[in-house]
C-alpha cells in the first residue's frame, strides 16, 4: 500500500510542478490556448495520443469490446492507429496548421466562422461543443471507481475530486504548454504500464499460447455466431459488422473532435508534422492496440462478481478484475497509468471547452472589448467552471446526461468532421452545406437516442459521420457558393513560398 501511495504522490507533484514551470507560456491568448503555435513534434504527438485515450478506453471500452469481440477487438486499436492517428495527421495536419494560422482562428468554431464567413455558424458550433463536450468530459472519470476501490479502497467521490483538483491546477497555471508537457510524461507512464500489464496478465494464464487455446474453447454467445467455438480467437471475431461500426466511430471520429484537431493548430513546423505523424501512430499502436488486445482475453476471467443481479455483465469491472491479482507494484503502475490517461484527456477537454466558450461566445457577444489579459483570465475561470461541472455530473449523472455521454463522440464528429475536412481542401463548400452537416450529425445521434431506429448508439455515430461526408458535397453542389474573391484569398495561403533545406526536399529539374 505504501508503494502505491508513494507513486501517486510523486505523480501529482510532477504534474503541479510542470504547471508552475509552464506559467511563462500562458501570458497571451495564443500562448494559453495553443502554446504560441510553436509546439514541437514530440509534445504535439503525445498531446494528441494521450487526449485520444482515457480511462474510458482502458477500463470501459477495452473490457466491453474485448468481451464482445474477443481478440478481434485488437482491430479497434489498429484502426485508431491507422485511421485515427496516421491518416488524421497526413490528411489534416499540415493544412489545418496553415489555414487556421492564415485565418487567425484558435478554435474549431472560430474556423467555421472565418472559413464560411458566418458568425451564426461560429456560435452554433460553440453551442454544439458545449452541449456534447461537457458530458463527454464527465465520462473520463468512468472506470476509476472500481480501479481505485481495488487498489486503495478509496470512495469514488474522493478519486474524482482529487483528479479534478490536480488537473485544474496545472491547466490553470500553464494552459496548453503545461498540458502538452504533462502529456509527454504521462505517455511514458502509459507506454511502460500497458506493456508490463499485458505480460503479467498473460503470464498468469500460462503464457500467450495457452491463453489463446483456452479462449478458442469458449463458444460464442453472439446471435450471428451462436455456439461456435473459436469465434473469440477468429480474425474478425464473432460479430464483424458491429466491430466495423466501433472501428469507424473511434477512429474516423477523431477527425471531427475539437480537442483532437486543435493539436494541429499548435504544431511548430513541417519537420514537427512529419515526426509527429510517426510518433503518434506508434503510440496508438502500443497503447490502443495493447488495451484492446488485453481486453480480448476478458472471458478468461469471468466470475460471479462481474454480473449484476439480473445476470448482465458489468463491463467496467472486467479489466479491474483481471488486474486484481497483480503484485502491488504493478497495480500501482496501472493506477498511475489510468490516472495519466484520464487527466490528459480531461485537461484537453476543459481547455477546449473554456477557450471555445470564451473566444467564440463570450468575446464580442457578451463581453465587449476584452483585452488579451482579460481573455486569459476568463479562460482560467472557465477551466474551473468546467472542471467543477464535470465533477458534479460524474458524481451522480442524471439519466439524460448519462445518455448524452454515450452519443457525444458521434454527435460532435458527425457535425464537424465533413465541413472541417472539406473546408481545408475544397473551395466549393457552401454555408448551407455546413448547416446541413450540423443538422445531420446532431440529428441522427439525438433522434436515435429517443426512437432507437439504429440498434447501437455506436453505429448511429458512425452513420452520422458517413452521412456528413455525403451531405456536404451534395448540398454544396445545389446551393449558392461563397464569394469567389474571399475563398481564393483564403486558399492563397497554400501557395505562399517557403524556403527549406535539401535534406527536407529535393529541387525540381
What do these predicted ranges mean?
Residues 1-509:
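Membrane-embedded helix-loop-helix hairpins and adjacent transmembrane boundary segments
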